[in-house]
Each structure stands twice: as C-alpha cells, then as structure tokens.
C-alpha cells in the first residue's frame, strides 16, 4: 500500500469517526407541556430515558438530550386517568428518527373522577402464548378478571400489569402481540407491560436491537407511574447476549441512573412497587457451582 493511499484511508477513517461522534453528542432540545383541560400540571417528571426533569408551575418542561433518545415520556401522576392508545397506556411519545435541534412534544391528561388511594392491582406473568388455540384461554382469563372485579371490588379503581413473557416465541409468532393486547383489554382495565426474555427479538446482532418488535407495540421498557400513594416502577432486566436464546439478568447503568433520579421524586416512606421479569432474589446465588444460570442478576440486584 503506497503512502498516498494510506493517507487517504486515514483521512476517511478520521472523518467518519468525527461524523459518528457528532451524531451521538449533538444535543436535541425536547420541550413542551403536560396539560389537563388546557392548563399546565406542575411537578410532573418528564424523561428521555436517561435524565428526568420536572414541569414548572405552568406545566412546561425542557430536556437537552444527547442520549439518542427513542421516547419522551412522563411518570403518570395520581389524580388523572391513564391515557390509552391502541389499548396500551400512552404515557410516551416516540421521537422522530432524525430530530431537528428542537422538538415540541405535549402531553394531555384528563382528571380522574375516582380516588385511587384504595385501588386493585391485577398481576399476570408468563402467559407465553405459543399457539392459536391458547388465545381463547387468555380471553377467558380476562373475562374471569372482569367478573371478579365487578363482584368483589365494585367501585374500586383497578389496574393490571403483565410481568413479561407475553408471548411464547417471537421468532415464529411476533404477530401474537396484537391479539394478546386485544385479549387482555377484555378485562376493561388499563394494563401495563413488562418485557420478558420470550418477548425479545433473537435473530439480531446485539442487545440494543432485541426490543424493536416489543417497543413497536408497548413503547419504553422501563418507566414509572403513580396510583394513590403507591409509586410503581417497571424495569427491564433482560440482557440478550446475541447467541441463540441466551440471556442474563442485568440492569444497565443508564437504567440504574434513571432509577436513582426517579426515586428522588418519591416522598420518603412511600410504598414503592417494582416490577421486572427476572426476580431480584434467587437461590441460585447460594450455589457454589459456577454455571450459565449463575450469571443472572445477582450483582445489580444489590443496588436496588
């Protein structure tokens, strides 16, 4: 390779490196309001998934984001209904793929007519639907929940959460996400969702690409919301290691830093409920033998 060609390749490499760094670090300002009936709501946490800011007394917020944010979203405050879109809680808005330097995003909430201080939380986990013939069972379970709430908890607001593994095999049946949303909506209560290992895209090159399908239906994989005096936090503790179906339990540093900021907004002494797919405690940690399963969330759990 002659010196002239080597110099040209070096310059090209340098220019591409500079472009890549600029694409990551150039700030984008996301701004707007959190409103109810045209009036701003104060002290609502707004996040890009990395940093959290609070709305001012007029409901205004501004985030200078350098994190390649996918969403701008809020911590749903108590006293307002859960906004729904496509039968999924709509506390988030997806940002443009190539945002301008300033992006305007507003959120509109409606006041709740019920007191959430006493409420019901329905928890499901691992429905793992693989086949068409299993869907009627989910529909029946939803009807059972609806009947139970009407019989035993009439007049008490109710919410639900699915703690991961919504479908069985995303590689063969990613289309099951949509009918699962429809089936669960038959409970007629708002349901939140947690990502599980069965909900990951597996034929991808890295963990960063493993949530594309899931996010297209449910949005952010970690977030929080308030109902009554309880602060609910949903975390994503699945890390795909880009080999077959293998994964480990792991909370990213970005997510932990977000969680620290989130919890700073919670009144000390409040009840905090954390939902994630892989448990924070496992007897595997007591085993002396080192194995694949021993890799799961035994370190990051200590920081919760």
Residue ranges of predicted features:
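Beta-strand-rich domain onsets/edges
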Residues: 18-29
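Short, ordered, surface-exposed loop/turn motifs in non-cytosolic proteins
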Residues: 28-31, 36-50, 67-68
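N-terminal active-site segment of His-dependent metallophosphoesterases
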Residues: 29, 36, 85-174
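Short, acidic Ser/Thr/Gly-rich low-complexity loop/linker segments typical of extracellular
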Residues: 50-65
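Extended active-site neighborhood of metal-dependent phosphoesterases/phosphodiesterases
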Residues: 78-83, 91-94, 172-260, 264-268
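Short acidic, glycine-rich surface-loop motifs adjacent to enzyme active sites
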Residues: 266-284
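Conserved small/polar residues in nucleotide/adenosyl-binding loops
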Residues: 293-300
């Amino acid at each position: 390779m002659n010196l002239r060609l080597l110099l040209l390749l070096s310059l090209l490499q340098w220019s591409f490196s500079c472009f890549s760094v600029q694409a990551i670090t150039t700030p984008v300002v996301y701004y707007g309001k959190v409103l109810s009936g045209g009036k701003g709501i104060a002290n609502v946490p707004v996040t890009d998934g990395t940093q959290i800011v609070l709305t001012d007394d007029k409901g205004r917020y501004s985030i200078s984001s350098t994190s390649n944010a996918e969403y701008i979203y809020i911590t749903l405050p108590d006293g307002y209904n859960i906004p729904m879109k496509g039968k999924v809680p709509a506390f988030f808005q997806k940002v443009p793929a190539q945002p301008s330097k300033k992006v305007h995003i507003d959120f509109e909430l409606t006041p709740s007519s019920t007191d959430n201080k006493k409420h019901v939380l329905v928890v499901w986990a691992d429905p793992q639907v693989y086949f068409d013939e299993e869907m009627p069972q989910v529909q029946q379970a939803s009807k059972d929940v609806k009947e139970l709430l009407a019989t035993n908890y009439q007049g008490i607001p109710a919410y639900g959460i699915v703690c991961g593994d919504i479908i069985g095999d995303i590689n063969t049946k990613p289309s099951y996400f949509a009918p699962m949303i429809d089936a669960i909506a038959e409970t007629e209560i708002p349901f939140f969702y947690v990502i599980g290992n069965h909900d990951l895209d597996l034929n991808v090159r890295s963990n960063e690409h493993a949530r594309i399908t899931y996010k297209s239906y449910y949005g952010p994989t970690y977030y929080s919301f308030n109902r009554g005096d309880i602060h609910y936090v949903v975390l994503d503790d699945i890390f795909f290691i880009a080999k077959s179906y293998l994964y480990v339990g792991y909370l990213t540093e970005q997510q932990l830093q977000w969680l620290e900021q989130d919890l700073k907004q919670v009144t000390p002494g409040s009840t905090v409920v954390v939902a994630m797919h892989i448990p924070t405690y496992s007897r595997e940690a007591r085993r002396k033998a080192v194995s694949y399963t021993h890799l799961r969330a035994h370190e990051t759990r200590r920081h919760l």
